Amino acid sequence: MSKQILILAGDGIGPEIVGAAEQVLTKVNEKFELGLTWEHGLLGGSAIDAHGEPYPAVTSEQAKKADAILLGAVGGPKWDTIERSIRPERGLLKIRSELNLFANLRPALLYPQLADASSLKPEIVAGLDILIVRELTGGIYFGQPRGIRELENGEKQGYNTDVYSESEIKRIAKVAFELAALRGSKVCSVDKANVLEVTELWKQTVTELQQAQYPNIQLSHMYVDNAAMQLVRAPKQFDVIVTGNLFGDILSDEAAMLTGSIGMLPSASLDENGKGMYEPCHGSAPDIAGQNVANPLATILSVAMMLRYTFREEAAAKAIEDAVGQVLDQGLRTADIMSEGMQRVGTVEMGQAVVAALA
């Protein structure tokens, strides 16, 4: 198979964290003789500066050719005042939509070395390992009609449309069930079926699919408000959570903080054939850009997810995850996960330490 990667560093801390991750990618590519090749492109603010738009045609062509994309982060205050339709975040929505990256996988995994970094008591989060499967190309973020209009009385009104078809729900539920079969065989589908018809259909469709094709997977349903509470109250009850775009966006960020730092969490966005875009869960953090303080581990772990889900190189993926564990065992910490008695290091040093652990 082709093994072509497109690297999009993006904005803010993107170039720094991607730089560290690229060193790790180079190391595993050599060590495991993976035969991967890659090129660089522009997305978001950097693309606006160079081409006047967040997702230019040249990047689109590169993305279509690639088997996997490694992204840093997009956005920053520099572009907050330009027209909404060409802001950096629009580039991210466009690439997801164009490549049909409908399945977003967000693990919330607590490294034992970082148990004290969580805001919850250690006994509540110890051993935490949740996978949130979020539908990424439908729902209220993409539904039409949408906009801001003026009513007859002169008052402005904002409106959006939350819409899901049966086929969209089925394909994301299928991903969740397939992944659950490799884990704890437990899926919790999150909806608001008591109020929203769109999630009433969601609940019904997920249930029918489970009964027809995945009878060995334990399925439960939870309203989103309760799910948000349960994630804080007793997070270890969850294994795989599947939900729509809006709910998934919110719950995955909440779950991220159970682990102590969003700087530790990778994500994958996949199409139906395993092509994917891999990126850290955190944003572009322009306030710390260029200071060599950002945590590159989420981006490095995104490389591990890429090797696992797109290239099916499990040994190489596991080697990266083990190397991250070794570095944490050595007491190395970036500022966001720093605790008493540990050694504070910068972005570059953390990346180099992971490379050394892979030797």
Curated annotation (Swiss-Prot):
InterPro entries: IsoCit/isopropylmalate_DH_CS, IsoPropMal-DH-like_dom, Isopropylmalate_DH
Positions contributing to Mg(2+) binding: 225, 249, 253
Domain of life (superkingdom): Bacteria
Matching PROSITE patterns: IDH_IMDH (PS00470)
Pathway info: Amino-acid biosynthesis; L-leucine biosynthesis; L-leucine from 3-methyl-2-oxobutanoate: step 3/4
Known EC number: 1.1.1.85
Tagged with keyword Secreted: no
Any Gene Ontology biological process: L-leucine biosynthetic process
Name this polypeptide is given: 3-isopropylmalate dehydrogenase
Source species taxonomy: Bacteria, Pseudomonadati, Pseudomonadota, Gammaproteobacteria, Moraxellales
Gene: leuB
